[in-house]
């Protein structure tokens, strides 16, 4: 019995003492294999124990059995440990004993490996037979090993084309018997050289390598590739290896035969251009020459036309230059404006007499001009005197005629009865203005006027004065809150246009506690603000004036209003806090009559009775 069998028995005795200790090293070893050439699209590889490829060596049958023993024991122990985790501790022991019994049976009773038909496997068989037998053992499990499930594959597989890991091989050999084993250093060096040769990257000055291509038909599987592939995968080792899955190459959709790169016209065309060997075909050359000839003929025609045009322009230029020269010569010959035909000598006396006459004429002319200027000045003075006299007459008439008349006893009694009435009856309803007894009682002494009474008086001023418009108190409220869009239809309701008016009156309610007045004088181009409680212009009055100016500009479509003056008009100041509405009505009355605002407090008292009389007599008829 050889030394290998003794070593094997010692290991079995050790495992009888400790049946859970493995017969193989727990360290996984890897080996670098070149890429599969016939299936370049596959990049993932599977790891399994049943698909290990071992290198075939011409050793004795003990070497074969020892390798087989290590392989089967490795898979059986792993299978036993996996089942123990599922079936329990006792089931694991049972599976381990069963597998170890099978292992002993195949080791000592069936000493030689056999095929499925019972024939012995020759030691010098080729790699293809052995690879098929190893594949059949992994699938049919003749030695009682567990099947190789697809779930045993790793989730994250390694790509051996980029990883070169050392190969660790162990053999149970007799001393001095069998083939000499190579040292691990030399095997590693050879593996590294093989991997480097397969995965080497070379750089060339020619980036495409047109002249070095050796191509074949795409999709063809050569015999050399398959033979090299089989030899590379027939190396068996114990441990874990990454295997490329064998997949059928995807065929083209239409099953058309692909043309090699060397035979394609595009590649040959690019190669010729890159190497400078490309020549234009004769057809293209002839067509190009023909097109160039046609272009030359067209150019000749164009040049003939251009020459004729240039000649004509040059002739015209020469003619014009000659004409100009002739004109200049004639002008130089007869350039004098005055031509002396005859000369006459004048004596000194005659010369002095002429000078005297000239001076006399100048003096006479100056006298005439002065007389004309004096007459104009007298006319201006006379016109000025007439204007002053007219103004004096108007003032006298206004002084004699009061704008706020006094009522007779009958009218005064009628107003007093209406103020004393306790029924809230309707006194007037005209032009969308309805006045009741409650509104009428605001005209009593020491009372604030409401917006209905002020609207009535504005309507009275509008009807009694031509080319005048007087809005109600809501006009400026909408203008200040909504801008021009809030009042753009108010002038249309009056059925007139702003450029045909003389004056516009707008009563202004300030914080619902005070009344003021805005006067737009379109003839004088002024916008005035009148307030009976203000001592002068302020920020609020300026804001009101600018709003009214913007309204005039928008209403007239920017034809007028830009050059209007914003002024603060002086008016009599109210001595109390309840006559602001009456003062607004009085300012409107005096402004519509172009009278100066010089009324007094007594006129304000009479103004209440006058407005009441207008309401009772229905002055809006």
From Swiss-Prot:
Family: Belongs to the peptidase C48 family.
Annotated InterPro entries: Papain-like_cys_pep_sf, Peptidase_C48_C
UniProt GO MF annotations: cysteine-type peptidase activity; deSUMOylase activity
Presence of the UniProt keyword Acetylation in the record: yes
Name by which UniProt lists this protein: Ubiquitin-like-specific protease 1
Keywords assigned: Acetylation, Hydrolase, Phosphoprotein, Protease, Thiol protease, Ubl conjugation pathway
A cellular component term, taken from the record's GO annotations: nucleolus
PTM annotation (N-acetylserine): residues: 2
Record's catalysed reaction(s): Hydrolysis of the alpha-linked peptide bond in the sequence Gly-Gly-|-Ala-Thr-Tyr at the C-terminal end of the small ubiquitin-like modifier (SUMO) propeptide, Smt3, leading to the mature form of the protein. A second reaction involves the cleavage of an epsilon-linked peptide bond between the C-terminal glycine of the mature SUMO and the lysine epsilon-amino group of the target protein
Chain intervals with Low complexity compositional bias: 124-141
PROSITE patterns, alphabetized: ULP_PROTEASE (PS50600)
Catalytic site: 514, 531, 580
GO BP, one annotated term: proteolysis
Enzyme class: hydrolase
Gene source species: Saccharomyces cerevisiae (strain ATCC 204508 / S288c)
Composition bias type Polar residues, residue spans: 179-196
Miscellaneous comment text of the record: Present with 377 molecules/cell in log phase SD medium.
Listed PANTHER family: SENTRIN/SUMO-SPECIFIC PROTEASE, UBIQUITIN-LIKE-SPECIFIC PROTEASE 1
Gene assigned in the entry: ULP1
One protein family per Pfam: Peptidase_C48
Residues bearing the modification Phosphothreonine: 179
Positions of modified residues (Phosphoserine): 21, 25, 264
Positions of the UniProt region annotated as Disordered: 116-150, 169-196
């Amino acid at each position: 019995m050889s030394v290998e069998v003794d070593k094997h028995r010692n290991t079995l005795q050790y495992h009888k003492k400790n049946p859970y200790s493995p017969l193989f090293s727990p360290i996984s070893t890897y080996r670098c294999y070149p890429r599969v050439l016939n299936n370049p699209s596959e990049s993932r590889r599977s790891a399994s124990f049943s698909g290990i490829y071992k290198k075939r060596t011409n050793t004795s049958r003990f070497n074969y059995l020892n390798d087989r023993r290590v392989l089967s024991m490795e898979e059986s122990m792993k299978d036993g440990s996996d089942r123990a985790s599922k079936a329990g501790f006792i089931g694991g022991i049972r599976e381990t004993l069963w597998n170890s019994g099978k292992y002993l049976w195949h080791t000592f009773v069936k000493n030689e490996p056999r095929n499925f038909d019972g024939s012995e496997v020759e030691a010098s068989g080729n790699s293809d037979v052995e690879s098929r037998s190893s594949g059949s053992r992994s699938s049919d499990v003749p030695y009682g090993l567990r099947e190789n499930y697809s779930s045993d594959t790793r989730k994250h597989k390694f790509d051996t084309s980029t990883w070169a890991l050392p190969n660790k091989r162990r053999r149970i050999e007799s001393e001095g018997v069998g083939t000499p084993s190579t040292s691990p250093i030399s095997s590693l060096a050879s593996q590294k050289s093989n991997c480097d040769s397969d995965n080497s990257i070379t750089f060339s000055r020619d980036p495409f390598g047109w002249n070095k291509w050796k191509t074949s038909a795409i999709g063809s599987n050569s015999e050399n590739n398959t033979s090299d592939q089989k030899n590379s995968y027939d190396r068996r080792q114990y441990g874990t290896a990454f295997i490329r899955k064998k997949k059928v190459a995807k065929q083209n959709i239409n099953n058309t035969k692909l043309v090699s790169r060397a035979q394609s016209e595009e590649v040959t065309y690019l190669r010729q251009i890159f190497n400078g060997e490309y020549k234009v075909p004769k057809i293209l050359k002839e067509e190009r020459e023909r097109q160039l000839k046609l272009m030359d003929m067209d150019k000749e025609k164009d040049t003939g036309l251009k020459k004729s045009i240039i000649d004509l322009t040059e002739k015209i230029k020469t003619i014009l230059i000659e004409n100009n020269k002739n004109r200049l010569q004639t002008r130089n010959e007869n350039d004098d404006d005055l031509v002396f035909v005859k000369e006459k000598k004048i004596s000194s006396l005659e010369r002095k007499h002429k000078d005297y006459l000239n001076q006399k004429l100048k003096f006479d002319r100056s006298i005439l001009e002065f007389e004309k200027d004096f007459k104009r000045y007298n006319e201006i003075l006379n016109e000025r005197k007439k204007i002053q006299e007219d103004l004096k007459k108007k003032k006298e008439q206004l002084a004699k005629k009061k704008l706020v008349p006094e009522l007779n006893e009958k009218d005064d009694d009628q107003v007093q009865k209406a103020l004393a009435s306790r029924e809230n009856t309707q006194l007037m309803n005209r032009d969308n203005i309805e006045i009741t007894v409650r509104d009428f009682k605001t005209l009593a002494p020491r009372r604030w006027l409401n917006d209905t009474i002020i609207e009535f008086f504005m309507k009275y001023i509008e009807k009694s004065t031509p080319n005048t418009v007087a809005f109600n108190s809501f006009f400026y409220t909408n203008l200040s809150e909504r801008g021009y869009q809030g009042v753009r239809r108010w002038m249309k309701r009056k059925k007139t246009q702003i450029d045909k008016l003389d004056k516009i009156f707008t009563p202004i309610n300030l914080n619902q506690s005070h009344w003021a007045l805005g006067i737009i004088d379109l003839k004088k181009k002024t916008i005035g603000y009148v307030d009976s409680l203000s001592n002068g212009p302020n920020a609020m009055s300026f804001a009101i004036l600018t709003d009214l100016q913007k309204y005039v500009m928008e209403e007239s479509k920017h034809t007028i209003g830009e050059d209007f003056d914003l002024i603060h008009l002086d008016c009599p100041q109210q001595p109390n806090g309840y006559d602001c509405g009456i003062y607004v009505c009085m300012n409107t009355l005096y402004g519509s009559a172009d009278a100066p605002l010089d009324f007094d407090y007594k006129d304000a008292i009479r103004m209440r009775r006058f407005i009441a009389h207008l309401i009772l007599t229905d002055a809006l008829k």
